[in-house]
Each structure stands twice: as structure tokens, then as C-alpha cells.
């Protein structure tokens, strides 16, 4: 994992500036199996456990959070395909390259109607990470009034470059547009051919994959601070000759390290539970969501302490610390890590109230 982390770290600044993962990083990620984590074994993938997936994603995020994020969203997109009873020849086509990047959005932002030769689909799906490097997209849509997951080659879609965000810039999470695209029936799963919504283990796997990027990015920030402590850098306007001479600096470093290591332990514990438990109850689901959100808060708190230690120079655009800070700030606001909804959902589960309202199409 160190090899892929080092390669991604060397290209992280360029990936951010480009708004797209550089080719060298993409090749390294593919070689590490990052985009085959949820490719079926029958098609050359690993269909990895949650533990294996988060360990790899976190290691990648330690070098480049944007590249790691695309690995996590590709996992989700390929996992979505398993919800449909697609013909064998369709799956052979979609998974022809087990290491190909996949993009997708489960929210039904498209509408289609059946015709004699297939479904005519139009729609717009925002925030499709890695779409410029993806080969296939798995997209939620309303087809003939019913929810469906539709598989479409990226070549049949238009990319609207809408992603312009303070952090996670290298993910290239632009919008996909379909304008009266003809989709063969064997690439549309709906009704009895669609097994949806996903089970608790699948939802939790997706959530912990999101957390893995936040944890890995915070560990990457800690690497920057550890390097600073090992250097001749000293606290400004003091008589100390090194950072490590300051009891306050040592205390702040200890707190930052404790926070991120606690988040890492939470991530691994959640992944282990997902792999071990055949089913997840509503109360367990809510508790795991709360734990994810708490771990994300630990990441945010840790990186703030690191910035305190580094001072204003940590915000220099040439300093990797500020990039990790921005990336962690953005990814920790993902719905899977939302703290107030996690608390609300846990409270509902504890009192056996109705679950959180589902989003409307």
C-alpha cells in the first residue's frame, strides 16, 4: 500500500489543480486493485470485504484524498449493479475490464419511457465523481413511473463540468446529462428485476468507505506534522530550538494523534462488524451511523490542532497540510457522516420511533 500512497502523494497537487486524477495516479490505483473492490469475482474482481476496502481507501487518501474518493464511489457504483437481475451478456460487457472506473448516482434524477427498441432516457445527475475517467455509469431513474437502475456507457452521456468546490477538487465530480438516450432493455433493472433498497450491510459498507477517505486524509495531514516535528522548525517567538521542546506543542500533537487514531479504530471496528454480522438491526444501523459521524468529528478536530501547530504557514498553497484540511472539511460533510442526522436517527431508534424520512424522487 505504501507504493500507491507515495505515487498518489507525489501527484496530489497536480490532481487538484487539474480537477482530475493524473494518469500516473490512476494507473497506480488500478494496479493496487482500487477500482476492482466491488467487481464480481466471476469477472476478475475481488468483491472485497469492508475491512480490505477501507484499509486500501484510507491508505490511498493518506496520499491523495481525491483519488481515494473515486475508489470509494466506484465501489458504490459497481455495488449498485448487483441490485439488478441483468443478463449475463450485459454483465460481461459492463465488467469487461474489472479495473475500470465506474460512476453513478442512485437518486432518480432521470426519466425514461419504454419504446419498441428500449428505454428513451433523459436526465441530469450531479456530483458523479470520476466521471471523466469512468467507462460505465449506474444511474437511478424513473422508468415508466417506477424506480430503475440503468446502466449506460459514459460515451452515451454528456459531462457538464460543474464541480468547483473548495476541497476534493481532484474528484472531478461533475454532472452527467442524458438527452433522449436509447438504453436497451437488458441494461434497465426495475420491478421484479430490481432488489432495492439495499440491505443494511451494504449501506454500512458504503458509509464506512466514505469515512475511510476522511480518516486517511487526516493521517496524511499527521504525516506532514510529524515531518515538521522531526525538522529544525521551532515555535515562533519563543526560545525553544525545536517544536518537540515545547510541552504545549507535545500536548497538542498528542491530542491530534489520539483523535485521528481513535477515528481509525472506529473505522476498522465498523468494517469488522459489517464483515462479521449477517444482518444489521435498525438500532445497530443507527448506532453505526452515529459512530461514523463521531469519527468524522474526530478527524476535523485533529486537523485543527495540526494547523495550530503549523501556524499560518500551514495555509500556504504549497503546503500539503492545507489541502488535507480542505479535503477533510468537505468529505466530512457527506450525508453518510452527517452529525445532526446521525444523532436524530439514533434517538429515533432508541425510542423505537419511525426511521428518518427517505428522500423523495
Regions found by a protein language model. Name each.
Residues 21-31, 35-134:
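Glycine-rich flavin
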Residues 103-106, 141, 154-165, 170:
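Active-site glycine-rich loop that binds ribose-phosphate moieties when present
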Residues 126-131, 206, 331-334:
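Glycine-rich phosphate/pyrophosphate-binding beta-alpha loops
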Residues 127-160:
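A short core secondary-structure module
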Residues 312-361:
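Glycine-rich phosphate/cofactor-binding loops in nucleotide/flavin-utilizing enzymes
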Residues 9, 13-17, 261-294, 304-315:
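C-terminal helix-coil-helix/basic helical segment that borders enzyme active sites and/or dimer interfaces
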Residues 166-260:
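Glycine-rich beta->alpha junctions and the first turn(s) of the following alpha-helix
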